[in-house]
Amino acid sequence: MKILGQRLTGWLLVLCFFLLPVKFGTLGLMPEQPSMFPDDLFTMWIITWPVYFIGIAGALLLGASALFFPAPRWKSPGGLTALFWGLLLPLAALPGLINAANRDYAMIHCVHWWSLGAFILSAWWVFSSGEMWKKYALNALAAGVLLTGIEGWRQYIWGFDEMVELIRKQREAGIEISRVMEIRILDARVFSSLGSCNTFAGFLLLTIPSSFVLIREWGKRFEPVKVSQLLFSALALLLLVPPLFMTRSRGAWLCAFLTGGIWFFTRPRIPRKYKLFCLAAGVLAMAAGGVLVARSGRGFLSGTERLDYLRSAAIMCTEHPLAGSGWGEFFHRHMKLKTTDSDESARSPHNPAASFACQAGIPAGVIMLGAMLVLLRELFRRQDESLLCRAGRWGVAAFLLHSCMEINDAIPASVICCAALTMALAPGAKEQEESSAPCALYRRSMEAGALLMALGVFCLSAYWLRGEAAFERLELALRPRNVQAQFAPASPARIMELLRECEALRPRSPYPLEMAGDYLVSTGDLENAKSLFERSRSFVSGRPAVHRRLALIAALQGDEEGAKNHLAAARELFPADPKNLEKNFFAEVEKKKSKFSL
C-alpha cells in the first residue's frame, strides 16, 4: 500500500510539473479581476486554469507525501531551499495582514504564499526520496516548457490576427472597446500561457538552459545518437529562443546579456585578452542598445518607473519598519509618492524583497532576500558537476536578476519552478543516506506538521476559490464573453442576486460592488450605483477610481460642486492620473450624458 501511495503521489507531482507552465502561469495577486473557470472539458483543455488551484494541488501533494514518503531532514539536499521558500516565506507574509486595509489583498497574499509553500515542500519531500522523481519531474517540466514555446509561436503567427478579427466583429456588433484596451490587445508581444509578455520572458530565462540540456538528452533514445541529439538541440533552440525575442522584453534581454557576461568572465580557462576584448565589445553593445532604447518607443520610461517603485518602497519601509504598511497598500501609497509623469499605477514594487519589506516589514524583506540568495549559493561551486546542473543554476541566476525588476513572484509556475530546479539540482541523495536515520519523534512531528499545513492550505484555497467562482459568475452576467449573450443581458434582479452571493463569500470586498455599480451606471440607475460605490468606499477608502465614479454620478445628476469635490479627492490620491484633471473629466462627462435621459 505504501509503495502504491508513493507511486501515485510521485506521478501526480510529475503531472503537476508538466502542467505548471501550461496551466498555472497566469498572474496571481490581483483580486480586482476574477479567475476564468473552464465551463467544460474542451474549455479546460484550451485555457489556463485559476492559479489558486495550485493550493489544492499543493495541499493534496503535501499530505500524500507526509503519509507515504519518509520524512527528509532540513540538512538534506534542497532542504535549505525548502525551508526558506516552503516555510519561512509563508510565515514572513503574515505580518502584512496587520496594517492591510484591503481584506482581499490580505487574503490573496496568504493564499498565494502558503499554496506555493505547500507545493514546494511536497516537491522537496518527494525529491529527497531518490533521484528517480527528480529526473521525471525535470523532464515533465521541459515538456511543458516546450509547449509554451509552441504556443508562443502560434500566438506570433496567428494569435494577433485573431485578436484583430475579434475587435472588428465587436465593433460591427456595436460593442464599445476602450482605446487603452485596444492598444494592449493589438500590442504584438508574445506571452504564451503566462500572465504577460514580461513574465513569460522571465520564465524562459529560468527554464531555457535546463530544458535545452534535457531535450538534447532525449535524442539519446534514437539512433544514430549524434544526429538525433543535434536535431533535438536544434528543435529546442528553434522553439524556445525566438519566443524570448518575440516578448520584446528589454529587461529580459538585458538580464540574459548580463548573466552570460558573468558566466564568461568567471571561466578560469578563458585567456585574459579575450575577456578584455569581450568586455570592450559588451560596453559598446550596451551603449548602442541604450541609444536605440532612448530613440524608440517608451524609451527609458519603464526603467525610471521601476526606480520610482523602489523609492516609494523605501519610504514605506521607514513609515512601518516592523510590520509593513500591509498587503495591497503599495498601490495607494505609491500613487501619492510617485515622481514620474505617467499614469501607471503599480500594485507591487516589481521586486520581491522590496515588496515584502514595504508591505510586511523589513524582517520579512530580509527573509525574502535570504531566500533569493539561497538559490544562488551553489552557483560558483562544484564546477565538475553535470552540464544540466550548471545550466539550471545559471538559468536560476538570470531569472532572479530579472525578478529584481519584474513581478515574477506573482506567477505560481515561475516561483515553484525556480525553487524546484534548485532542489532537484542539489547534490544527490547519497549524502542523506550516509547520515543516520531521523528519530521517530522527528518523523512524527514532521508528518503532523505537514498534514496540518496541508489541511490549512486546502481549506484556505477552497474558501478563496469559492469566492472567485462567485465573482466570475457576476462578471459573466455583466460582461458576457460571447456576442449572443451580450444582446441578451441578465436582468437587474439576477445581477443583485449574484452580487449578494459574492458578498457572502467575499465579505468587505470592494470589487464586486464596483463592477455592479458600473453596470447600474450604464443602465441609468444612478442612485443605486451611488449606494454601491459608497459601500465600496467604506471598505477601502484610498481608491481614487471610486471617487472618480462618484464624481461621474454627481456630474450626471447635475451636482457640479459634488463632482468637483470627489474629483479633488481622486486627484489627491493619484495626482499623476490625467483622468483626474477637471478638463479631461468633464469632457468625458459630456460624452456620457448623451447615453442617459436625466
Regions from the language model: what does each represent?
Residues L41, E172-E176, R306-C317, E472-I495:
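Short extracytoplasmic/periplasmic juxtamembrane "stem" segments immediately C-terminal to an N-terminal membrane anchor
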Residues K2, D384-E385, L421-L465:
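A juxtamembrane structural motif centered on a specific transmembrane helix
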